[in-house]
């Protein structure tokens, strides 16, 4: 006996209009089951449990676990999960923590979900990719919904949004939260994301000037194997985006994939077709995410190095050769709030001439800036973590006119402060050798400093013991090798213009 879906099903969910009838029926039945399961949500908990959560949400969860006997009316496992989740949200998702009535999943899901700054960045990225018309006609499909943090921010840029998640525990939590957040245009589907992808209609080829609604598919493949161990290779993640690449590009105009920051983005470019953008996203100088944007048509590859309000972008030809340096002129314009990351508007060329794109042959003929041995540089520049991850060291030197200390240290020198440099800047106080007399003279009166080593034979701890310095303070020591000589650079932090 064949079960078929009636016309009302297709009217209810535009994404099902080209599905086979049996597939559409199964998907909608799963959606109905999830809607029924939401009865276990916070709205159905007794008053004693809700009051316990509200009263103790800032308390130590380990201590609260012993209060079960004294609170027999409290659903203690659920209450402890909510308190722990809210405490994590206060750190990772402050906007959610400030919203009463949200429900939180188990601890592991909270730790694995995106932070608020990175979710906002992806929302702004999606909005730029699909344009303003997506709010009236666009479709977002998140095939790996999870707790729904990324989905909840991205969905606001689309007329219709579909959340797909195979974990039957997470789906009702996500649906409850979406309702609390005012997302009334979303569909929840429980099941395998790959199966849902294969049931999606093919997206027609678009011609210039076409006004058809855009479809964007988002994936955050699970980076743990069946034994719970972390994996980092794309083929080891679930789902395998390398295997699905062709299928994804047949069913979406744009595909955004989130990968581990441990992955080499050059490897991703080699294994996946039609990557048009690579985003290396850091928060507070800690690399958090690697985002890939795939498009149906082949485009020049652009790399975005993002760290809070600092963004540096450049274009590469093929898989590795640079074409141009690019810089967003104003860091402040990248934010709509103090804590939000936003996708940059690209301004191509060198800072001195932002309107001109540097031709490929000209870029490779540019001599890297060098420092004269007789000149004493006044500023040391340290690239942020996204620059380090992207490996765009030549691009930085050419774009800002600064010189590298060495090809291995990835530290730069300048005769003055460099506006908009994507990293930290330090005023050089002294440069010394490792000679005992030179060290004694250079560090006279210095008892405390932060120490970093780059291409240097000693570890930071070993050097600290040798210099007999306490950790911390306002001074910074960078130990590196210049040519064949080991050097220590004593600095203090510089407020960049």
Predicted regions and their residues:
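SAM-dependent transferase fold signal centered on methyltransferase-like domains
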Residues: 5, 9-18, 22-497
């Amino acid at each position: 006996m064949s079960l078929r879906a009636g016309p009302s099903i297709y009217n209810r969910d535009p994404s099902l209009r080209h599905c086979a009838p049996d597939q559409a029926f199964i998907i909608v039945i799963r959606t109905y089951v999830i809607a029924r399961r939401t009865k276990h949500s916070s709205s159905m908990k007794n008053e004693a449990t809700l009051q316990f959560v509200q009263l103790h949400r800032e308390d130590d969860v380990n201590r609260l676990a012993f209060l079960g006997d004294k609170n027999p009316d409290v659903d203690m496992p659920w209450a402890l999960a909510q308190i722990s989740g809210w405490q994590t949200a206060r750190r990772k998702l402050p906007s959610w923590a400030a919203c009463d009535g949200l429900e939180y999943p188990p601890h592991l899901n909270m730790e694995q979900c995106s932070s608020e700054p990175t979710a906002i960045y992806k929302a702004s990225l999606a909005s730029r990719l699909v344009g303003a018309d997506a709010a009236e006609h666009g479709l977002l499909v998140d095939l790996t919904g999870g707790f729904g943090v990324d989905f909840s921010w991205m969905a606001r840029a689309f007329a219709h949004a579909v959340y797909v998640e195979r974990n039957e525990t997470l789906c009702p939590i996500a649906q409850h939260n979406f309702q609390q957040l005012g997302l009334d245009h979303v569909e929840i589907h429980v099941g395998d994301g790959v199966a849902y992808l294969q049931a999606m209609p093919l997206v027609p080829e678009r011609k210039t000037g076409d006004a058809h609604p855009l479809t964007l598919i988002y994936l955050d493949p699970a980076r743990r194997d069946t034994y719970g161990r972390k994996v980092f290779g794309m083929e080891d993640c679930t789902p395998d985006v390398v295997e699905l690449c062709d299928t994804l590009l047949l069913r979406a105009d744009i595909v955004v994939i989130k990968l581990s920051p441990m992955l080499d983005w050059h490897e991703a470019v080699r294994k996946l077709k039609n990557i048009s953008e690579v985003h290396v996203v850091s928060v507070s100088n800690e690399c958090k995410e690697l985002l890939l944007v795939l498009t149906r048509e082949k485009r020049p590859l652009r790399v975005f190095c993002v760290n809070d309000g600092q963004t540096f972008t450049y274009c590469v030809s093929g898989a590795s050769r640079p074409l141009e340096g690019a810089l967003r002129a104003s860091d402040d314009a990248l934010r709509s709030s103090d804590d939000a990351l936003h996708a940059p508007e690209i301004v191509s060329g060198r800072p001195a001439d932002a309107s001109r794109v540097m031709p490929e042959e000209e870029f490779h003929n540019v001599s890297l800036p060098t420092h004269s041995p007789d000149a004493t540089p006044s500023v040391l520049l340290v690239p942020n973590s996204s620059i380090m991850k992207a490996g765009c060291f030549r691009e930085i030197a050419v774009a800002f006119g600064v010189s590298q200390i060495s090809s291995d240290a990835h530290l730069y020198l300048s005769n003055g402060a460099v506006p908009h440099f994507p990293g930290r800047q330090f005023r050089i106080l002294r440069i010394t050798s490792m000679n005992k007399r030179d060290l004694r003279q250079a560090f006279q009166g210095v008892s405390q400093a932060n120490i970093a080593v780059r291409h240097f034979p000693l570890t930071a701890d070993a050097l600290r013991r040798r210099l007999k310095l306490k950790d911390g303070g306002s001074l910074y020591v960078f130990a590196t090798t210049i040519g064949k000589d080991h050097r220590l650079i004593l600095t203090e932090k510089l407020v960049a213009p």
